[in-house]
Amino acid sequence: AKNIQYFGAGTRLSVL
């Protein structure tokens, strides 16, 4: 599943 989670002050982490 493609999930985009935002951490910190706008750090984009793309999860597989």
Curated annotation (Swiss-Prot):
The keyword Endoplasmic reticulum does not apply. Keywords: Adaptive immunity, Cell membrane, Immunity, Membrane, Receptor, T cell receptor. It comes from the Eukaryota. GO terms for biological process: adaptive immune response. It is found in: Cell membrane. One of its GO terms (cellular component) is T cell receptor complex. The keyword Ribosomal protein does not apply. Alpha-beta TR is a heterodimer composed of an alpha and beta chain; disulfide-linked. The alpha-beta TR is associated with the transmembrane signaling CD3 coreceptor proteins to form the TR-CD3 (TcR or TCR). The assembly of alpha-beta TR heterodimers with CD3 occurs in the endoplasmic reticulum where a single alpha-beta TR heterodimer associates with one CD3D-CD3E heterodimer, one CD3G-CD3E heterodimer and one CD247 homodimer forming a stable octameric structure. CD3D-CD3E and CD3G-CD3E heterodimers preferentially associate with TR alpha and TR beta chains, respectively. J region of the variable domain of T cell receptor (TR) beta chain that participates in the antigen recognition. Alpha-beta T cell receptors are antigen specific receptors which are essential to the immune response and are present on the cell surface of T lymphocytes. Recognize peptide-major histocompatibility (MH) (pMH) complexes that are displayed by antigen presenting cells (APC), a prerequisite for efficient T cell adaptive immunity against pathogens. This is T cell receptor beta joining 2-4. It comes from Homo sapiens (Human). The lineage of its organism: Eukaryota, Metazoa, Chordata, Craniata, Vertebrata.
